[in-house]
Amino acid sequence: MSKKEVAIYTDGACSGNPGAGGWAAIILFQDYRKDIYGREENTTNNKMELTAVINGLKVLKFSCNINLYTDSLYVKHGITEWINKWKMNGWKTSNKKSVKNMELWKELDNVASQHEIDWKWVKAHSGDKYNEEADSLARKAIIDA
């Protein structure tokens, strides 16, 4: 049986950085759509971006082929370029400093390993329908305390 084809759009937002933050993911499979979002106090935009991706992937019950869309180059570069070097260096950067948000990166690495993922960067606020909707949900999460 072939893997299901899924699209996930994610976004994170912060009111202040650090400050109250929101994250959102829109999961699309055939005619099915699921929106998830949440809020955290005293967080950062990058943490919210990572949290959005992690929670979007956790929704999936089976191994899938995923097109994952993020407007965060931090997430895209981190998972596609930097993470393997960090792991080889004991979760240290090239400057020998601990990787920021290491626990979230480890969790993302774990949940992502269960899927085939094509990581795609979308320019924020450029008119991409689902990216705009994920952004709205993440911002809504901040104010819906």
From Swiss-Prot:
Its EC number is 3.1.26.4. The keyword Metal-binding applies. InterPro entries: RNase_H, RNaseH-like_sf, RNaseH_domain, RNaseH_sf, RNaseHI. Coiled coil: none annotated. It comes from the Bacteria. Its cofactor is Mg(2+). Residues 2-143 form the RNase H type-1 domain. Keywords: Cytoplasm, Endonuclease, Hydrolase, Magnesium, Metal-binding, Nuclease. Its main location: cytoplasm. SUPFAM superfamilies: Ribonuclease H-like. Mg(2+) 2 binds at D11, D135. One of its GO terms (molecular function) is nucleic acid binding. It is found in: Cytoplasm. It catalyses: Endonucleolytic cleavage to 5'-phosphomonoester. Mg(2+) 1 binds at D11, E49, D71. This is Ribonuclease H. The lineage of its organism: Bacteria, Pseudomonadati, Pseudomonadota, Alphaproteobacteria, Rickettsiales. The gene is rnhA.
